[in-house]
């Protein structure tokens, strides 16, 4: 609730610009794609919407490429996915959706073949459902 200082605002704009340039060069992955509907239709801040899907996405990823997830967790300073998931819940809180919304958003994601193609392995509807189940509180 504090007022944003000019210095902090400048740093925020700089980091946002650098992040935008990185995304423009590398693209984004599944948590980012899953965040679109949650942000647009439910008003959840974009960063939070991306973050709530990270741990569950990494769980699905670990089923295919456990060594990659192990390296990610090590680089982030976490020993386990559970530790990482707990940390994300602590800083982001939870997001609640209705089952109707979840089903609609999953349907839309499955139609988004360009975003599904960013995943380094084939992502099934069941995988997306699992990610939602572990990331969202269904009302």
Residue ranges and their predicted role:
Residues 75-139:
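C-terminal charged capping/lid subdomain of soluble metabolic enzymes
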Residues 1-86:
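Active-site segments that bind and position negatively charged phosphate/pyrophosphate groups
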């Amino acid at each position: 609730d504090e007022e944003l200082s000019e210095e902090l605002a400048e740093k925020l704009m700089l980091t946002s610009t650098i992040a935008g340039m990185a995304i423009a060069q590398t693209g984004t992955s599944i948590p980012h794609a899953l965040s679109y509907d949650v942000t647009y239709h439910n008003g959840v801040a974009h960063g939070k919407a991306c973050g709530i899907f990270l741990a569950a996405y990494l769980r699905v990823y670990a089923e295919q490429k456990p060594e990659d997830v192990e390296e990610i967790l090590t680089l982030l300073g976490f020993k386990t996915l559970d530790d990482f998931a707990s940390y994300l819940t602590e800083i982001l809180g939870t997001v609640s959706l209705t089952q109707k919304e979840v089903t609609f958003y999953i349907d839309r994601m499955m139609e988004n073949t360009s975003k599904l193609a960013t995943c380094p392995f084939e992502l099934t509807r069941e995988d997306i459902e699992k990610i939602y189940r572990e990331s969202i509180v269904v009302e």
